[in-house]
């Protein structure tokens, strides 16, 4: 969205062009993947937005991203593992960093301020609902600052 939220559970039966495809279920020729520089290693932690970045790079190079409703992937929300190994609150660091970095990289700087408010609301909501502790707010702040200063690849 214009304020940085990644839309989830988008379902359609229609095949067509889109800006990006979720990284857990997309295919690209190795030659094209390599030519575009693969995934940007500045996207850190929980694998968020590196797939959108790659889709934007495909389009910028004149390629197309096609959504095909045929293949289906089910994202299992396991209780342990993944980014939760370090600290549940640290996920806000990755999310904040990657969001700001993505918006800067793709010249969407006017969307950074709304994204900051959105990310702050997520961290506060998670605190109120006891999904994460108060450290989530600190991690979100650190991620925002680091995302602002990470050198663009």
Name the predicted role of every residue range.
Residues 51, 76-77, 121:
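Short secondary-structure boundary/hinge segments and terminal tails
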Residues 20-21, 25-37, 42-72:
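A short, conserved alpha-helix in the catalytic core of glycosyltransferases
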Residues 9-12, 36-39, 80-86:
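Short glycine/proline- and charge-enriched loop/turn segments
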Residues 46-47, 74-97:
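Nucleotide-sugar-dependent glycosyltransferase catalytic core
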Residues 9-11, 24-26, 54, 65, ...:
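Ligand-binding pocket scaffold of soluble enzyme catalytic domains
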Residues 89-98, 108-153:
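Non-catalytic, C-terminal membrane-associated alpha-helical segments of glycosyltransferases
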Residues 1-19:
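Short, flexible, basic/aromatic active-site loop/helix in glycosyltransferases
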